[in-house]
From Swiss-Prot:
Region Disordered, residue ranges: 38-60
An MF annotation (GO) of this entry: chorismate synthase activity
Organism: Haemophilus influenzae (strain PittEE)
Record's function text: This reaction introduces a second double bond into the aromatic ring system.
Cross-referenced InterPro entries: Chorismate_synth, Chorismate_synth_AroC_sf, Chorismate_synthase_CS
Name of this protein: Chorismate synthase
UniProt-annotated binding residues for FMN: 125-127, 243-244, 283, 298-302, 324
Domain of life: Bacteria
């Protein structure tokens, strides 16, 4: 399995499975002399970790990160940073029924077909639990971006099912409000509707999809390497690598289909851009405007409603998911998406500095 690393100069490699001993990652390319400790990383992990509200999986994990290397006397040394998070609240017995059968909508079938073996406990490597280490690595990237470039990477939940939040204007989003509710939502009226919907889904044993938006502010002009390493291409690659993500939009995204050129083009004046339909990226290079990325996440297939599938022998079976799962995976995906955007931005910033300045 060779797809465990992302980035060129700022490189993140993750390892571990959902019900293994621990999760871990190696982060290469962190510049030296960045003040860093577990306290800088833990807040983002706490935003992602399970069991923090009635809207997410009841699985409880402390998700306490431990830095193993690359930090000396409170500062990064420029060498590889190793981190681990130990798993604690596994209930592997919940997955005995799917040892020889495939859960519909999951990676069980494709992993088995590709490798001829799979860790069926909680999905193994394909579980979203792996993303905890992406969040840990992303927290380092976010800290460096903020302290050295003034770049802020923040996200919010913009839709669950058919419920959409009120339109948000960059620069006017109340980020304290976003972080004060379990849905990471800036619209109080939508929070109440989200609450009602999730309660209903939990009673039904079903799940729902979601959409979330990440905004990176104060990004300088010039990030991105045309033609194959365009900034928007790398952002899409990173965000599509998140479990359950089925679509990525930059700026207006798919809405551009209905726009005319006279509407979509971001006209310029001596005072700057008049609009930001492009989402802060032109020709694959950052324009200096806020970068806006939106992702769509599918409803999880881990539901208690029986579903048809097959077993290892290709025979028809019925599958009822046991274990503990999120009714909407989009809720805990906000810090994950932030992390992936931050990782890509820091990688491109280091590449830009190496080539252009």
């Amino acid at each position: 399995m060779a797809g465990n690393t992302i980035g060129q100069l700022f490189r993140v490699t993750t390892f571990g499975e959902s019900h293994g001993i621990a999760l871990g990652c190696i982060v290469d390319g962190v510049p030296p002399n960045l003040e860093l400790s577990e306290k800088d990383i833990q807040p983002d992990l706490d935003r992602r970790k399970p069991g923090t509200s009635r809207y997410t999986t009841p699985r409880r994990e402390d998700d306490e990160v431990q830095i193993l290397s690359g930090v000396f006397e409170g500062k990064t040394t420029g060498t590889s940073i190793g981190m681990i998070i130990k798993n604690g609240d596994q209930r592997s017995q919940d997955y005995g029924d799917i040892k020889d059968r495939f859960r519909p909508g999951h990676a069980d079938f494709t992993y088995q077909q590709k490798y001829g073996i799979r860790d069926y406990r909680g999905g193994g490597r394909s579980s979203a639990r792996e993303t905890a280490m992406r969040v840990a690595a992303g927290a380092i990237a976010k800290k460096y971006l903020r302290e050295h470039f003034g770049i802020e990477v923040r996200g919010f939940l913009s839709q669950i099912g058919n419920i959409k939040i009120a339109p948000q204007k960059v620069g006017q989003i109340d980020w304290e409000k976003v972080n004060s509710n379990p849905f990471f939502c800036p619209d109080e009226s939508a929070v109440e509707k989200f609450d009602e919907l999730i309660r209903e889904l939990k009673k039904e044993g079903d799940s729902i999809g979601a959409k979330l938006t990440v905004i990176a502010e104060n990004v300088p002009v010039g990030l991105g390497e045309p033609v194959f390493d365009r900034l928007d291409a790398d952002l899409a690659h990173a965000l599509m690598g998140i479990n359950a993500v089925k679509g990525v939009e930059i700026g207006d995204g798919f809405a551009v289909v209905k726009q005319r050129g006279s509407e979509h083009r971001d006209e310029m004046t001596p005072n700057g851009f008049e609009s930001n339909h492009a989402g802060g990226i032109l020709g694959g290079i950052s324009s200096g405007q806020p970068i806006i990325a939106t992702i769509a996440l599918k409803p999880t297939s881990s539901i208690t409603i029986p579903g048809r599938s097959i077993n290892l022998n290709g025979k028809p079976v019925e599958v009822v998911t046991k274990g503990r799962h999120d009714p909407c995976v989009g809720i805990r995906a906000v810090p994950i998406a932030e992390a992936m955007v931050a990782i890509v931005l820091l990688d491109h910033l280091l590449r830009f500095k190496a080539q252009c300045k």
